[in-house]
Amino acid sequence: MMNKIKNPIYINFLNLFLNISLYFFVITNLDINKFYALLFYLSSFFLIFYSFNFKTIFFEKFLSIFVWLGFPFKLAIPYVALSFGYEINLFPENSSYNNFSKDVYNDAINFSSCGILGFIFASIVRKKYIFFYSSEKNLIKNNIWFFYEKYKFKILFIYIITFISINFFNLYFEIYQKGISFDFAPKFLIVIFKWLLLMGLSSFACCFVYYDLVKKKNYKFTSVLFLLESFFSNISILSRAFVFNVGILFISFFHLFKNNVRIKFSVVLSLLIFAILLIFLNINITSKLRNCVVNYQNIDKIEKIFFSKNCLVSQKKLLSNEISGTLNKISSLSFARWVGIDSMMAVMSKKESLNLSYYIFFLKEKKILYEKSYYEKYFLNQDKSKTHIINTNHIILPGFVSYQSISGSKFFVFLSCFVLGIIGAYLEKFSYRYSYNNFILSAFISYLFVFRMIHFGYLPFNTFIYFLAIIFTFLQFKIYNFILHKIKIL
């Protein structure tokens, strides 16, 4: 019980200390309105506070972490780094946007605060009227659970073979990689592979971990399996976001710990060490595979990109003199790549153009090959995409809060963020209910939704399709349960 009480106190103290420290770094280095900055950091503190205390859900935890990293943290970190003798560019994608006026900073802080307040009010409403987890973790035994218990080793063996095969075929046939447009056919296979690699395979791993964790069986093995599947899938799609999948697992452990469910410290520690090693390898390998795309010289495209001679030679040098380079890459990603305040300032720099009609114009954006996104064209003054032999499609995204600011209305930003918070709460509620109380799967579902909205801002209609895919990801288990009931296999 003492651990249950102490734990939030430590988190709250750290939260308060960090926000106060960042506030003083900002007001001593930037010519901005100190009162606006105070409200900005106070609202950031309360967002984390409400997300990690009293009737918490995973959606709000993930959302508050991403928002905090993208806004208060990213605004202050260049000056924190400077005090230690390091230099960090607040705008790594567009260095010409370093000289903003005082008014732009103040407007960006005010609009950001409105969005954060919208999330806070949504959290308050959610706790009172919508959904929160009970302290009891009751496993709802269903046909899927009985099937897993009866055929566990066969299921896990088939699963391992399946995810290894899917990842290999995806890389070899170049079916789906982030930021790259291939001409793979048939198109329905791209959709299937995309769903499996982004959501499907991991959703099954969430079930395996949940069943073993709740029944207090060998959850270490299925946790390792969850990490390995996420690791290989992220490499296969050239994503460096594996660290967030790690976060899902450990935030789930933290959720159990808060509710006084005992988990072996030695198991958590060994999983953490293993996860850190995989994070290092994920960033290293993915960076090299991305370089294979950029440096690909086979005009006839006879040679497979990721299995070409040059690419394979590059991979063999994986750990040769690469440690410092990978650490620098991790440092860069940790400090500069969060989506938030930089895009808000880019939007506020064109404040005279912002209105609801302009916002609606952005909502109608359509994909045009070799063209930059609307955000890049109209706010970052970028035009044509760079062309390579392989058609890369790297997009700079403003994020949900900054995107809503295109309306030019603080109230609209507040209301949009409030509505998003309510939608996220209901999504987690339904995913928890329809997955038979599988809180690890509902954590994964909430992460998928938060990650998409934090990186919102290109082809908005595609986000609706992505949302439907998320809903299917947890509803599929209702379908499997129904099928098992009908065929009476148990």
Report the location of each language-model feature:
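N-terminal "leader" segments that precede or initiate the main folded domain
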Residues: 1-140, 247-284, 459-483
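Membrane-interfacial loop-to-transmembrane alpha-helix junctions, especially the N-terminal start
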Residues: 5-15, 56-70, 152-155, 217-224, ...
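Hydrophobic, membrane-inserted alpha-helices
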Residues: 17-24, 43-46, 203-207, 224-232, ...
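Membrane-embedded catalytic interface detector for glycan/lipid assembly enzymes
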Residues: 31-34, 90-100, 123-263, 267, ...
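Hydrophobic alpha-helical membrane-insertion segments
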Residues: 60-78, 154-167, 275, 359-369
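Central hydrophobic cores of alpha-helical transmembrane segments
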Residues: 61-72, 222-230, 267-274, 417-421, ...
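Small-residue-enriched transmembrane helix-hairpin modules in multi-pass membrane proteins
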Residues: 183-187, 279-420
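Hydrophobic alpha-helical segments
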Residues: 392-490
